[in-house]
């Protein structure tokens, strides 16, 4: 019997198989609990000092640079489908995830490009297929002659068999020459070829992240061109090296690892001895590990020094040179920092050229200049012709010298032929190339000059508009081409500045056709070259100048992606005669190309406007190139920088905007710091001439136009000066940058697009520096634009601001190297930051749009805001938040957003140091806007106001913001909460009223819910707010506004209304108020005796709660005075009064007797109560109505106004129902009753007194008095009239009788009968169909058994009337 299989055995085997399926370097999506499937790459645990686990897959996550062991089931391969899905869903998952997606996509594209590079056919096809991502390969750009075309056709085989190409010395040289000769056609072809097969310079975009991609892209291009193939192999190797370096930077690998693969590729590429110097140069350049003497060695390593020295390796010379830089750097076992690999590569160890080789000869420049220069001459010549006639003439002379080129080395021969071809195709090619070339390509290094004199020191003209232009920064890198080659080289690279520029322009244009060649080497050496450019900036910047005429072409060139590699190549081609290394050669080639675009105009003395124009077009192209071609620029800059480091101080002088952007080196730092923005900075820092200009331009953001100064004149001193100037610019720029960038913060704002636009021609800067691929200039802008990044800018500054002009080139080189190192880190960091900022900002905006009042949502948005603060854009984050809050229509969400502000503030408060103050200061400045948006004016925002007050009080308690500021805003919110009560009738929203609020019964009445329409009827009468006093119930306040009580809530109203039971009064009424009211009642009792003589109307003086004395005297007098006025007949009054609302009951029948008139019927009281008097009125209403001295029938009419609120007439808006409340609260004396011990006196109000004889019962009270408070001063009625009736005279008196038909007699109201209490039954007056519910169950008046009518308000004691006795 077979043994039973162990349970789970198959599962374990499956797991192991799945683990084995994943290989190191595979791109995957790994799922970790709590996170989405995260982009990662399979790595080796050993590299991270972790013990391997056979059952798990060890991955390194992109974006966060974290590692983890994942189950095989949680790891899935990264495919094209997954790529598309991630692109659509990345923005809602945070900045880290967005960054991770970008990185894995770049790596994915890089791997695909590497595969294509390894397979020439696939590489060529791939490059053609990915035109949008790549710039045209030199081969594509160039339209070779029939031979060159044939060679190009055979290029795939050559690319396939690079070693074969290298071995074919003569054939390769011939091919190179033919290709260059046909560079003009190629340029034309570039126009078409660019479209046909853009080389995978798209890897340049990858280069943004890692230089390896650039080199890889360059490799396919190199394969495309046979002549370039010599470079191509090295390029491929360099690209691989760079790619590995990039991978190392991304994956933490060291350059050594990269070297291994790259060196192997380089070793595979052997150049034949017959290749002559160009081959030797290429080989030497490829032999980055070998010395210059070893250039003849079989291994073709890229060494820019050798290339420069030899100038023989035309194709490989410039390109290989760039590769050399990377190789050298690798060779030097330098560990490339992530994102800084290329820049560090710039630090490539320079190897001494072979003693046999001439540093100053054109040969030095020729290796690169030939390969690149030949392609460039025509392209560059076009530009140069436009820019500088001299350079063009010299260039022309060179071709003449090269007519019999058989005796010339292959490289020189190729150059001569290229130049001739260039002249033929100059016009057509220049336009085509201009279109094809990217802004970076447009950046033309100054002509590679044979000697310092040849080097043209001219400043880059930066677009005066900082935000729009980074004026041909590439000029610097192009200018950095300091070539002291043989006369032939001079014709292209070694020519005098003007000549070099001309030829450079030609080469540039031709090189635009040969951009592949220039790009490839540049790309490969982009990292190192970029660093070289950084080192070169001081010296080569002098030579580099963007010709105005060239600039237009440059603009054209910049327009096309393919141009970018050429420009970069040109920059790399920057070669000084002093620069012996191969980098010089590659720089020379690149420089010539760059010069062709940038230098000629300046050499020809054209205006900066051309440069600026070129910059404009370059900016446009650059935006595109930044995505794809920026890598090329970085490569070029690196090559140039390495050259500058190795060779002359003139390189130190070179400062390109794009280079500064792409190059994290001194130049970039200087530009960044000096100008605050690349656009502001001068691309070129001339040794002596540029020195003064640069600081100015840095401050003024103006384009510094440097004069063309030969390297000979400039010399080391100028290089030193340039370095010094650059440093000064850095220091000056640090301050200016901060200011200017803050000013141009909108344009800079770390937006990749803006940074791309601002980035000048310099390819290296825009392309390589940031591992993220964000334009370096943007990073610079970002840092400069924010004070928070100011420190970074300061750190960017590399050396001391001033360097003695007497210093030697070595000093300059050392300084430049240091600056390059610094700038490399800074630029890359800035690019990464820029990309991070953009993604974080998008995530932040998404979080604001989807914010809800939950801890998770607010916490996530807070974290994103903190991330933005780290990037230095806290002010922008708060601006976005304020804008979102202001544009939010939902009031509830406004509170949510304000809670986010609170979260950010408290989180910032918890931070240590000055970082916590960043947001707090921003919040403090923008807080008024935030509060105005969160709590807009209106009565419907009370909830928002409450929540904001809570937040502010919490801030006050925790001292989040200065106490004075917080208290100020709290007071404002409090005032806003009070104002609406006064401005908008104090009626609370229906939903805010308590269920037992009598207002609910009055909803259909025209009077307000508190039984008064005084607010509507007394427009000129200012009613003070009683929100706070309702509880206190002061007479003055109550008298001021019958609505004062209405403002209060139902409970408040009850507590203030004197009709409430004593328990309520005790709860809500202050003792002092109660005492005061008690005195008033006693006085009122005393005044009841005076009522006989005085009319019941003590109006004027009793408008507000009067003290007892005032009420006694003034009320009586006023009553007498106004008595005749009010003593109109009820009928007359009713006629003049407004009609009753449809819902109001008919007026009550007249009381049976004058006693009835004198006494208020229960129904009247009820009606009055139903009138909805609130606390203010109710303060005195609560007291029993007291009978005043007998009055004529007219007095009954006067009491009518109180009841008129309930009468149909009084219900109308015209009837001031508030009068009733005033009446109740008037201090006017009512019947003195021996019994009525006044209950706890309610708050005094103007309505505390009523008209004598008017016994008012709240509309709310039922007919029975048992539910009402035991007393209310009858003077309330009088007071009622005082406040409101005086405003409305006779017409309102009708209200008094709304329950009583007007009595025929107008005699004294007070008769003997009326002295006796009137039973409620004595009133036949009309009452409401449904007696209003008692207000908060307050007891109504308790009629005495013998009472003939309702007890007067003033006499209302618990359950009984107090009849006045004579």
Curated annotation (Swiss-Prot):
Residues 836-977 form the CID domain. Residues 1138-1152, 1229-1244 have a biased composition (Pro residues). Disruption phenotype: No visible phenotype under normal growth conditions, but the triple mutant plants hulk1, hulk2 and hulk3 show delayed flowering. Coiled coil: none annotated. Residues 1032-1052 have a biased composition (Acidic residues). Residues 24-81 form the PWWP domain. SMART domains: PWWP, RPR. InterPro entries: CID_dom, ENTH_VHS, PWWP_dom. GO terms for biological process: chromatin remodeling; flower development; mRNA processing. GO terms for cellular component: nucleus. Residues 111-138, 203-319, 384-403, 427-451, 787-808, 1027-1076, 1128-1366 are annotated as: Disordered. Its main location: nucleus. It is found in: Nucleus. Probable transcription factor that acts with partial redundancy with HULK1 and HULK3. Plays diverse and essential roles in the control of plant development, physiology and flowering time. PANTHER family: HEPATOMA-DERIVED GROWTH FACTOR-RELATED (PTHR12550), PROTEIN HUA2-LIKE 2-RELATED (PTHR12550:SF49). This is Protein HUA2-LIKE 2. It comes from Arabidopsis thaliana (Mouse-ear cress).
């Amino acid at each position: 019997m077979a043994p039973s299989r162990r349970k789970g055995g198959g599962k374990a085997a499956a797991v192991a198989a799945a683990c084995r399926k994943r290989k190191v370097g595979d791109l995957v999506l790994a799922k970790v609990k709590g996170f989405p499937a995260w982009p990662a790459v399979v790595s080796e645990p050993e590299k991270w000092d972790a013990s391997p686990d056979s059952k798990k897959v060890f991955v390194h996550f992109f974006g966060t640079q974290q590692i983890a062991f994942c189950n095989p089931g949680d790891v899935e391969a990264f495919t094209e489908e997954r790529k598309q899905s991630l692109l659509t869903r990345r923005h809602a998952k945070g900045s880290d995830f967005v960054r991770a997606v970008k990185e894995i996509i770049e790596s994915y594209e890089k791997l695909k490009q590497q595969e294509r590079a390894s397979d020439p056919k696939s590489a060529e096809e791939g490059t053609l297929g990915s035109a949008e991502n790549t710039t045209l390969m030199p081969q594509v750009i160039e339209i070779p002659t029939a031979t060159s075309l044939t060679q190009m056709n055979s290029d795939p085989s050559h690319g396939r068999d690079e070693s074969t190409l290298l071995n074919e010395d003569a054939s390769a040289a011939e091919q190179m020459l033919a290709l260059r000769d046909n560079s003009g056609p190629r340029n034309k072809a570039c126009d078409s070829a660019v479209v046909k097969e853009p080389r995978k310079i798209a890897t340049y975009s990858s280069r943004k992240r890692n230089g390896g991609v650039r080199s890889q892209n360059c490799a396919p291009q190199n394969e495309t061109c046979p002549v370039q193939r010599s470079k191509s192999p090295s390029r491929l190797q360099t690209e691989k090296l760079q790619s590995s370096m990039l991978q190392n930077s991304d994956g933490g690998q060291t350059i050594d690892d990269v070297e291994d693969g790259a060196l192997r590729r380089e070793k595979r590429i052997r150049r034949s001895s017959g290749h002559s110097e160009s081959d030797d140069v290429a080989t030497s350049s490829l032999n980055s590990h070998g010395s210059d003497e070893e250039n003849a060695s079989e291994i073709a390593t890229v060494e820019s020094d050798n290339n420069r020295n030899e100038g023989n390796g035309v194709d490989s010379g410039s390109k290989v040179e760039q590769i050399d830089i990377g190789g050298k750097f690798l060779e030097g076992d330098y560990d490339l920092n992530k994102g800084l690999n290329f820049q560090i590569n710039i630090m490539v160890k320079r190897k001494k050229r072979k003693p046999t080789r001439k540093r100053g000869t054109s040969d030095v420049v020729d290796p690169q200049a030939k390969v690149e220069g030949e392609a460039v001459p025509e392209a560059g010549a076009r530009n140069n012709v436009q820019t500088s006639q001299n350079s063009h003439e010299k260039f022309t002379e060179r071709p003449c010298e090269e007519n019999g080129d058989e005796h010339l080395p292959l490289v020189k021969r190729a150059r001569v032929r290229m130049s001739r071809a260039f002249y033929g195709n100059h016009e057509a090619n220049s336009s085509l190339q201009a279109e094809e070339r990217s802004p970076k390509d447009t950046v033309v290094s100054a002509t590679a000059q044979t000697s310092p004199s040849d080097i043209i020191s001219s400043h880059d003209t930066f677009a005066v508009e900082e935000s729009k232009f980074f004026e041909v920064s590439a000029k610097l890198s192009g200018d950095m081409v300091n070539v002291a080659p043989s006369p032939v080289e001079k014709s292209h690279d070694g020519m005098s500045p003007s000549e070099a520029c001309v030829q450079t322009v030609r080469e540039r244009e031709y090189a635009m056709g040969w951009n592949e060649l220039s790009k490839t080497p540049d790309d490969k050496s982009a990292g190192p070259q970029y660093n070289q450019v950084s080192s070169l900036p001081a010296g080569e910047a002098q030579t580099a100048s963007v010709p105005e005429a060239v600039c237009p072409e440059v603009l054209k060139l910049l327009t096309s992606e393919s141009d970018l590699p050429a420009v970069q190549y040109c920059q790399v081609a920057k070669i000084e005669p002093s620069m012996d290394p191969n980098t010089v050669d590659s720089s020379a080639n690149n420089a010539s190309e760059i010069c062709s675009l940038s230098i000629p105009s300046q050499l020809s003395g054209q205006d900066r406007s051309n440069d600026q124009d070129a910059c404009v077009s370059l900016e446009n192209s650059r935006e595109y190139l930044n995505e794809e071609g920026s890598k090329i620029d970085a490569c070029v800059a690196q090559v140039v920088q390495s050259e500058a480091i190795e060779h002359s101080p003139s390189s130190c002088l070179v400062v390109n905007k794009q280079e500064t952007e792409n190059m994290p080196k001194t130049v970039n730092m200087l530009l960044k710091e000096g100008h605050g923005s690349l656009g502001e900075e001068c691309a070129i820092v001339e040794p002596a001439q540029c020195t003064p200009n640069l600081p100015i331009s840095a401050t003024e953001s103006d384009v510094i136009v440097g004069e063309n100064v030969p390297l000979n004149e400039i010399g080391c001193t100028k290089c030193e000066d340039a370095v010094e100037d650059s440093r000064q610019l850095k220091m000056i720029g640090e301050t200016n940058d901060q200011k200017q960038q803050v000013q141009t913060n909108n344009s800079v704002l770390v937006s990749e697009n803006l940074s791309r636009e601002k980035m000048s021609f310099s390819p290296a800067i825009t392309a390589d520096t940031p591992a993220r691929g964000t334009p370096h200039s943007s990073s610079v802008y970002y840092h400069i634009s924010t004070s928070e990044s100011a420190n970074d800018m300061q750190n960017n500054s590399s050396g001391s601001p001033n360097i003695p002009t007497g210093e030697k080139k070595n000093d300059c080189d050392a300084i430049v190297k240091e600056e390059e190192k610094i700038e490399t880190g800074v630029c890359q960091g800035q690019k990464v930051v820029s990309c991070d900022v953009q993604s974080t900002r998008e995530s932040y905006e998404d979080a604001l749009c989807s914010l809800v009042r939950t801890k998770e949502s607010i916490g996530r948005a807070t974290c994103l805001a903190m991330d933005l603060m780290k990037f230095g854009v806290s002010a922008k984050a708060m601006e976005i938040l304020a804008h979102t809050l202001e544009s939010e229509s939902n009031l509830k969400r406004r509170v949510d957003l304000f809670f986010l502000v609170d979260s950010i503030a408290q989180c910032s408060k918890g931070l240590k140091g000055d970082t916590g103050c960043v947001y707090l200061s921003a919040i403090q400045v923008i807080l008024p806007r935030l509060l105005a948006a969160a709590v807009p004016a209106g009565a419907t925002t009370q909830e928002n106001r409450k929540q904001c007050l809570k937040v502010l009080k919490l801030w006050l308690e925790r001292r989040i913001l200065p106490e004075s500021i917080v208290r100020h805003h709290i007071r404002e919110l409090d005032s806003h909460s009070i104002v609406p009560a006064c401005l908008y009738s104090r009626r609370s929203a229906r939903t805010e009223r308590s269920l037992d609020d009598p207002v609910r019964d009055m909803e259909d009445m025209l009077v307000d819910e508190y039984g008064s329409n005084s607010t509507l009827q007394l427009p000129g009468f200012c009613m003070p707010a009683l929100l706070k006093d309702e509880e206190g119930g002061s007479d003055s306040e109550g008298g001021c506004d019958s609505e004062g009580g209405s403002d209060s809530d139902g409970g408040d109203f009850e507590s203030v209304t004197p009709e409430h039971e004593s328990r309520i009064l005790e709860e809500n009424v202050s003792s002092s108020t109660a005492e005061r009211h008690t005195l008033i009642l006693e006085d009122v009792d005393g005044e009841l005796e005076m009522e006989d003589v005085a009319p019941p109307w003590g109006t004027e003086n009793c408008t507000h709660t009067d003290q007892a004395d005032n009420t006694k005297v003034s009320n009586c007098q006023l009553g007498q005075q106004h008595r005749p006025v009010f003593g109109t007949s009820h009928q007359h009054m009713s006629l003049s009064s407004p009609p009753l609302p449809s819902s109001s009951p008919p007026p009550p029948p007249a009381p049976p007797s004058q006693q009835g008139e004198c006494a208020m019927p229960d129904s009247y009281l009820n009606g009055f109560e139903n009138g909805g008097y609130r606390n203010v009125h109710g303060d005195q209403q609560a007291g029993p109505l007291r009978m005043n001295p007998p009055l004529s029938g007219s007095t009954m009419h006067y009491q009518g106004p109180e009841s008129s609120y309930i009468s149909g007439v009084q219900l109308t808006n015209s009837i001031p129902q508030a009068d009733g409340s005033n009446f109740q609260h008037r201090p006017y004396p009512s019947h003195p009753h021996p019994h009525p011990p006044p209950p706890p006196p309610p708050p005094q109000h103007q309505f505390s007194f009523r008209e004598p004889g008017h016994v008012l019962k709240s509309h709310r009270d039922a007919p029975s008095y048992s539910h009402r408070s035991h007393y209310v001063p009858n003077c309330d009625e009088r007071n009622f009239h005082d406040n409101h009736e005086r405003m409305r005279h006779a017409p309102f008196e009708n209200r008094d009788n709304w329950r009583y038909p007007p009595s025929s007699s107008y005699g004294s109201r007070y008769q003997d009968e009326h002295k006796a209490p009137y039973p409620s039954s004595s009133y036949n007056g009309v009452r409401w169909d449904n007696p209003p519910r008692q207000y908060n169950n307050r007891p109504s008046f308790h009629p005495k058994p013998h009472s003939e009518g309702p007890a007067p308000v003033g006499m209302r004691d618990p359950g009984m009337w107090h009849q006045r006795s004579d």
